[in-house]
């Protein structure tokens, strides 16, 4: 395919145009008075969302060069989402502001490589400052505040997440599922999460989120390597007749057997997913036994005289729901409280008997996984469209609270970044020279962008609000919900430090890369040829 090559200023301007389009459509959602965006779907009802990364993933432009700009800035959003699970809109707005400011300097003749070095040094300084200003989370009230802000100022959601964290612990698993009623409810159930994902991405049932969701599945638990599909055929036939999904937990599945499972899954013969067993050696056997107790199944192992080809349905475990991503598996079980408690007691006794601190630590991990359970938030809404929006907001809120527990909280609403701008200017003037100094000042001017946008979405003058916030002390910011200047910690308007840090780092990274671009190579669109006029068919230009 022929390529189109664009150089210098033209290349950067084309990228900028794509970025403008994406940044504007994402920025309208920022802040308590941010609006929603409607996404048209090829199948089903349109989706109404308020989540930056979901909007960014949907935007695809006709012009290949502009589309490259969209992809670059989308990366800032998705990397922030991967690292912190929230703050995607902030990352997009920041990256866009840095690129805009930087391109002005490049057009005026500044050296892009020196600017990039300045941007990187500024980002390093700001990361340290964010860590300095972060406060550790002490109580569930602070957790509720973080959750409420991330869910779009929904205090009920904040309280629910704080309650869930109280019950399953800060490291515990909080899972989301679609509820059957109008109310959003919280339920604590048995379950566990371990850090092994699906063996093949073809097992994913939701291609957009790349995860496999199995409702009321059967679970085959074995500690052997499955090399031949013949070993599995008897079980697969029994499960296919029962019409339920199947999860296979094994040491490994070799290529031939895996290929057969994938083909059967894609053809719809049996809804199956396969996951490698967690842990190593004796710990793997112990963890498989934990999972068997949790799901009411048996570990099919030759140590107990059980063979795969002789496995029956009543040897398989059962669960309410299993969610598998590329990195981890969450099992939501139910109804085995007695057995789970007995197993926990057994692990506690082992902990008392062992002298090895390593073994104690590993037993403690197993106990936490088994005893902690899973908090299930059942999302309720009047319509399916509202349900999907609420689910995305709740997901953001859960991620944000976990990030807040990890690295603490800072004043929210764009306040932290706005207050750090003068500090960065002072530091840069003392420590950097010439174009590196210009690079760091690009960042300092861009730091006000999220606050300005939040104010503009609330109908205020962003530039004026930004300057007024800079004059006040560090914890004072602009509450866009009622247009007042308040102490952000007291008002409960807080952001996780990890979210602010990730958004800043990813924005600086993308901005630096865009500014140093001097040439773009993209595919040239092929001209569409009209169909030749044929007997009775008509040419491509005729109306029928």
Swiss-Prot record:
The keyword ATP-binding applies. InterPro entries: Chaperonin_Cpn60_CS, Cpn60/GroEL, Cpn60/GroEL/TCP-1, GroEL-like_apical_dom_sf, GROEL-like_equatorial_sf, TCP-1-like_intermed_sf. It comes from the Bacteria. Keywords: ATP-binding, Chaperone, Cytoplasm, Isomerase, Nucleotide-binding. PROSITE patterns: CHAPERONINS_CPN60 (PS00296). It is found in: Cytoplasm. The keyword Glycoprotein does not apply. GO terms for biological process: protein refolding. GO terms for molecular function: ATP binding; ATP-dependent protein folding chaperone; isomerase activity; unfolded protein binding. It catalyses: ATP + H2O + a folded polypeptide = ADP + phosphate + an unfolded polypeptide. Its EC number is 5.6.1.7. ATP binds at residues 29-32, 86-90, 413, 479-481, 495. One of its GO terms (cellular component) is cytoplasm. Pfam families: Cpn60_TCP1. Signal peptide: none annotated. Forms a cylinder of 14 subunits composed of two heptameric rings stacked back-to-back. Interacts with the co-chaperonin GroES. Belongs to the chaperonin (HSP60) family. Together with its co-chaperonin GroES, plays an essential role in assisting protein folding. The GroEL-GroES system forms a nano-cage that allows encapsulation of the non-native substrate proteins and provides a physical environment optimized to promote and accelerate protein folding. This is Chaperonin GroEL 2. It comes from Trichodesmium erythraeum (strain IMS101).
């Amino acid at each position: 395919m022929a390529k189109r090559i664009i150089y210098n200023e033209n290349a950067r301007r084309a990228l900028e145009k794509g970025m403008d389009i994406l940044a504007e459509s994402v920025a309208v959602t920022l802040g308590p008075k941010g609006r929603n965006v409607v996404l048209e779907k090829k199948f089903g009802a349109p989706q109404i969302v308020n989540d930056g990364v979901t909007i960014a993933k949907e935007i695809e432009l006709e012009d290949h060069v502009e589309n490259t700009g969209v992809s670059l800035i989308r990366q800032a959003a998705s990397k922030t989402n991967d690292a912190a699970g929230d703050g995607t809109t902030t990352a997009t707005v920041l990256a866009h502001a840095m690129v805009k400011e930087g391109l002005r300097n490049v057009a005026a003749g500044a050296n892009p490589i020196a600017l990039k070095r300045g941007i990187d040094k500024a980002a390093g300084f700001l990361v340290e400052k964010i860590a300095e200003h972060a406060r550790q989370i002490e109580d569930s009230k602070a957790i509720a505040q973080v959750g409420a802000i991330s869910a779009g100022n929904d205090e009920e959601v904040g309280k629910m997440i704080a309650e869930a964290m109280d019950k399953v612990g800060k490291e515990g698993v909080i899972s989301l599922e679609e509820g059957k009623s109008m109310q959003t409810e919280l339920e604590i159930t048995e379950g566990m999460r371990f850090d092994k994902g699906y063996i093949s991405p073809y097992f994913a049932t939701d291609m957009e989120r790349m995860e496999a969701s199995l409702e009321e599945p059967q679970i085959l638990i074995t500690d052997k390597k499955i090399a031949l599909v013949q070993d599995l055929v008897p079980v697969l036939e029994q499960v296919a007749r029962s019409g339920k999904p199947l999860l296979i937990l094994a040491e490994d599945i070799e290529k031939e057997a895996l290929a057969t499972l994938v083909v059967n899954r894609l053809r719809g013969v049996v809804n199956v997913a396969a996951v490698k067993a967690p842990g190593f050696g004796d710990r793997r056997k112990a963890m498989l036994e934990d999972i068997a107790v949790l799901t009411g199944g048996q570990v099919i192992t030759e140590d107990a005289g059980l063979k795969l080809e002789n496995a029956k349905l009543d040897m398989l475990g059962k669960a309410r729901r299993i969610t598998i991503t590329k990195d981890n598996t969450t099992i939501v079980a139910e109804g085995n409280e007695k057995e789970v408690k007995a197993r926990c007691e057994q692990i506690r006794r082992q902990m008392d008997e062992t002298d090895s601190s390593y073994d104690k630590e590993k037993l403690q991990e197993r106990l936490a996984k088994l005893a902690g359970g899973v908090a299930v938030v059942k999302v309720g809404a009047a319509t399916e469209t509202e349900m999907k929006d609420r689910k995305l907001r709740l997901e953001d809120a859960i991620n944000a609270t976990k990030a807040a527990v990890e690295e603490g909280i800072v004043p929210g609403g764009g306040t932290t970044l706005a207050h750090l701008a003068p500090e960065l200017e002072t530091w840069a003037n003392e420590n950097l020279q010439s174009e590196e100094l210009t690079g760091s000042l690009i960042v300092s001017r861009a730091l006000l962008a999220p606050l300005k946008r939040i104010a503009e979405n609330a109908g205020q003058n962003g530039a004026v609000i930004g300057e007024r916030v800079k004059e006040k002390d560090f914890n004072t910011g602009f509450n866009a919900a009622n247009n007042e200047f308040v102490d952000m910690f007291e008002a409960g308007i807080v952001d996780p430090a990890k979210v602010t840090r990730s958004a800043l780092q990813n924005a600086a990274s993308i901005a630096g890369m865009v500014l140093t671009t001097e040439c773009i190579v993209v595919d040239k669109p092929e001209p569409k040829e009209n169909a030749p006029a044929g007997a009775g068919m008509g040419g491509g230009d005729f109306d029928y």
